[in-house]
A protein has these predicted regions:
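Bacterial N-terminal signal peptides that target proteins for export
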Residues: 9-12, 20-29
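Bacterial N-terminal signal peptides
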Residues: 27-39
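Signal peptide processing junction and immediate N-terminal pro/mature segment
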Residues: 40-46
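Aromatic- and Gly/Pro-enriched helix-to-coil junctions and flexible linker segments
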Residues: 46-89, 99-105, 230, 234-550
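N-terminal accessory alpha/beta regions
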Residues: 91-119, 131-135
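Acidic/His-rich structured neighborhood in mature extracellular/periplasmic domains
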Residues: 118-219
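Mixed-charge (acidic/basic) macromolecular-recognition segments
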Residues: 188-258
């Protein structure tokens, strides 16, 4: 019941789109705190997102649209001000860009600050403010992870045209350098971001500065962190809530495109859903129980066993605890928050309303549309094919306004070509390693350790140096899950994108060959691979570049 309440409440914005919603925030916080102590549901892992191209198939990311053709603002405080300027001030006095510090986290940059972790924490930020008039919405659509010592910003931002979050990385983000923006290797990101969306820890957010012990060490290490105030659980809560809402975008898009179906009946279903979303946004009215009959009929056919609701929650982790818990690994498959056995029409309609241009909704509802009947305008949109089975887009609202003589004139930024970093090479003397591990470990980045990057001689030397840790992680496929101190490599999510189930992989000749290769490397250096699993992983020889680990 607690999870149901959490899903229904936290999936709705506490802003102008939901009357009296701010009164719910104290109750939402109590629910979240209770959930931190609740056991995980014993349900199967949520379905993994199919393999997707790194570059957007359509459109561009919200981050690209925000930056345009200009360099990424530097330093970070300037970038934060640029983002803040797109959003309305928070009525409660908090920044619209909610930001916290994580010195000992679980991201790819977890070792970038070593040995000065508290002097160089990771900055995690979520856009949580309503957009200003004429500005594309950023709320729940833009998330940042900045690391000063790593000279990098990891960006997750929404692409309305493709109905997906894009993963990007800003490299060379440092004084005297020109920041370079790339679309990241999507499969690498999805190993942890299993819903292709942002993730965050469950309460009590002990990795963040909300933990008094963490905050105390941060204050001792440094006086100023890019103008960011050390915050309590309030900021962490808002970031958590933003990731919850963002992960529901895929649910609303699925119901919009697939739930309603194709053809005229599907178009009319979407017209009814859009009309209900506008009615909720303008007047706060919820849909009737018998609304969307086409969705109800299609549900039984498309999802006879229910629709899994994505889970963005990592287990809460105290990095200062004496004993690490393997269950906190973000690579482990996560169960869905819930399985919907029937369509939650109220949540669907409220979710669609939450994806609209908030400033345009308020302006049209109060000053222009008033209580006008929108049915004729929506019918014209349907006749033109604008309600076909394609991604739900805030531009639909602008199309409705245009029907009433209020055209939307967006400022179209000239964007540089979208680009990715160099491709992985699956040839050479280490073909097996490159094939099985190159997606994550053959890159110019230091994290995760790029022991497969370079010519054959360099790769061989790096494999020698990393052999102990590679052997340890590969060997965990032959250890029962309950006895593992780390997640095995390659991650199960990466295997799944290649159509390999974990049981098949554990018995595969490929895994045996990888193990034999590193076993021989360890012995050639005078080591004993047979005893490595009895040692704590952190005591094994550090992988390259020091002190990172695979």
């Amino acid at each position: 019941m607690a999870r149901t309440a959490r899903r229904r409440l936290r999936g709705v914005r506490a802003d102008g789109l939901m009357p009296n919603a701010r009164r719910l925030r104290p109750y939402l916080f109590i629910i979240a705190m209770c959930l931190a102590l609740s056991p995980a549901w014993s349900v199967p892992a949520q379905p993994l997102v199919p393999t997707q191209p790194d570059l957007p198939p359509l459109g561009r990311s919200r981050f690209d649209q925000l930056i345009g053709n200009a360099p990424v603002p530097f330093p970070y405080a300037r970038l934060a001000r640029t983002i803040e300027a797109q959003m309305q001030p928070d009525p409660g006095g908090l920044p619209a860009l909610k930001t916290t510090l994580i010195p000992l986290g679980r991201s790819l940059q977890k070792n970038a600050g070593a040995p000065d972790f508290f002097r160089f924490p990771r900055v995690v930020a979520a856009a949580d403010g309503l957009n200003k008039a004429g500005v594309e919405p950023l709320q729940d659509r833009l998330f940042l992870g900045f690391h000063e010592k790593g000279e990098v910003i990891e960006v997750i931002s929404y692409n309305d045209a493709a109905a997906r979050f894009e993963f990007q990385i800003v490299r060379d983000y440092a004084p005297g350098k020109t920041p370079q923006v790339f679309y990241a290797r999507r499969s690498l990101c999805l190993a942890c971001h299993q819903n292709a969306a942002p993730i965050f820890a469950r309460p009590l957010w002990d990795e963040t500065s909300a933990n008094p012990a963490i905050a105390r060490r941060l204050r001792d290490a440094r006086k100023d962190f890019y103008g960011i105030k050390l915050s309590g659980t309030d900021i962490a809560y808002f970031i958590d809530a933003a990731t919850e809402r963002a992960n529901l975008f895929s649910v609303w898009q699925t119901l919009w495109q697939q739930g309603c179906g194709a053809g005229e009946s599907g178009d009319r279903c979407r017209m009814e859903a859009f009309s209900a979303a506008l009615d909720y946004a303008r007047n706060g009215r919820l849909p009737a129980a018998d609304a969307l009959p086409t969705l109800a009929r299609n549900w039984k056919i498309r999802w006879p066993h229910g629709l899994p609701i994505p889970n963005p929650d990592l287990p809460n982790r105290d990095p200062l605890a004496a004993l690490p818990d393997a269950a906190n690994d973000p690579l482990l498959p996560r169960p869905p928050l819930a399985i919907w056995r029937a369509p939650d029409k109220t949540a669907f309609i409220v979710g669609l309303a939450g994806m609209l241009d908030t400033a345009a909704v308020k302006q049209s509802a109060v000053k222009q549309l008033g209580q006008r009947d929108l049915s004729a305008a929506l019918e014209r949109l349907r006749a033109r094919g604008e309600l076909a089975a394609r991604p739900f887009n805030p531009s639909l609202l602008h199309a409705v306004l245009a029907e009433f003589g209020m055209p939307h004139r967006p400022s179209l930024a000239r964007l540089p070509p979208a680009r990715i970093e160099a491709d992985v090479r699956f040839t050479g003397a280490h073909t097996l390693f490159r094939t099985q591990c190159g997606l994550c470990h053959d890159s110019t980045a230091n994290f995760p350790p790029n022991f497969l990057h370079g010519d054959d001689a360099a790769v061989s030397a790096r494999l020698d140096h990393c052999a102990e840790r590679i052997f340890y992680r590969l060997s965990l496929w032959h250890v029962t899950a309950a006895r593992r101190s780390k997640s095995p490599m390659p991650p199960s999510s990466i295997l799944a994108t290649r159509g390999i189930d974990v049981e098949t992989w554990a018995r595969s000749p490929a895994l045996a060959a990888l193990l034999e290769d590193v076993r021989l490397r360890i012995r050639a250096q005078g080591g004993q691979p047979e005893i490595l699993l009895a040692r704590p992983f952190e005591q094994l020889r550090a992988c390259l570049p020091n002190p990172a680990a695979p």
